[in-house]
Amino acid sequence: MTSAAMWLLAVQGIIGAFDTLYYHEWRARLPARGAIAAPELKLHAARDFLYAVLFGTLPWVAWHGVWAVVLAAILVAEIAFTMADFVTEMSVRRSLGDVYAGERVTHAVMGIVYGAMIAVLLPALSTWSQQPTALRLAPAAVPAALRWTLVVMAVGVFVSGARDLYAAARLPHADWPWTVNRAM
């Protein structure tokens, strides 16, 4: 695993955390928007669970053989969910006047970083795909602090995805700590 891929993944995690906490939670208060936000929240949850796998495994595990194909499918699925999210946001955010301008810029930067990460990850994926099928413990050649930071990010993004899924299901107290006028 290249160190560049790990650093780009960390940058993606930092920008993604900012996007989630500032735009999705604070500004748009998506979990409190009820049924109107459910489609967007479901997409966010799906992406979050994929990112939890990436953050939790890439710093530690080599995806050999068929597992390299599974990893490639996860990477492509994230792109598909992101594209669907772009379309879904238009209807969900209509009552807010659209997606915030800064949020659009944030999403563009995240797309660029993700693309760069995939580009530097492709040689490893190619090598891994030629190996016998196995998930092998192979800590990335980066500082241990970075590997453990990515594990913390895996936990954080998993919790965020669970929150979004909980809110999309409109379960009790899913809007905490927010309240909004849902008639907006």
Predicted regions and their residues:
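Short, highly charged, low-complexity non-transmembrane loops/tails of multi-pass membrane proteins
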Residues: 170-184
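Juxtamembrane helix-capping/reentrant segments at transmembrane boundaries
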Residues: 31-45, 97-105
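Helix-coil boundary and interhelical linker segments in multi-pass alpha-helical membrane proteins
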Residues: 1-7, 53-71, 120-148
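Membrane-interface helix-loop junction between the first two transmembrane segments
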Residues: 18-39, 172
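Individual transmembrane alpha-helices with interfacial aromatic-anchor signatures
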Residues: 103-110, 140-154
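Membrane-proximal helix-loop-helix units in multi-pass membrane proteins
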Residues: 65-137
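Transmembrane alpha-helical segments that form the membrane-embedded catalytic/substrate-channel core
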Residues: 13-22, 75-92, 153-170
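Core segments of transmembrane alpha-helices
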Residues: 44-59, 108-119
